[in-house]
């Protein structure tokens, strides 16, 4: 029985799942807004939020821990230079999930994952 087992499988192997969430977290830290399915968005919080908490204290050891989890230098740089200082006084809850309808092909529920307190870009205001 599968009682008390946390985390979703998404019909993927553990390596595929781990790689998918590394890539999604790296994209989130680069662009600060991504669109994905709602279950993936909910599961992404478990990966991304601890990394932002880690980035609050900028040290070589923390950068190495973050790089081990993300494997992306640009994302780690953004995490420690931009996001860590931005959320230094926030005790958690760095991500916001916004439901945005259903995907055309398979009617999967979709959601935007964005970082709270992110600067609004002029292009997005025009939309």
Curated annotation (Swiss-Prot):
Alphabetically ordered keywords of this record: Ribonucleoprotein, Ribosomal protein
InterPro entries to which the protein is assigned, alphabetical: Ribosomal_bL17 (IPR000456), Ribosomal_bL17_CS (IPR047859), Ribosomal_bL17_sf (IPR036373)
Domain of life of the native organism: Bacteria
Record has Ribosomal protein as a keyword: yes
Listed GO MF terms: structural constituent of ribosome
Biological process terms in GO annotation: translation
Ribonucleoprotein found in the keyword field: yes
Pfam family, one: Ribosomal_L17
GO cellular component entries: cytosolic large ribosomal subunit
Subunit structure: Part of the 50S ribosomal subunit. Contacts protein L32.
Family: Belongs to the bacterial ribosomal protein bL17 family.
Entry protein name: Large ribosomal subunit protein bL17
UniProt source species: Stenotrophomonas maltophilia (strain K279a)
Top-level taxonomy: Bacteria, Pseudomonadati, Pseudomonadota, Gammaproteobacteria, Lysobacterales
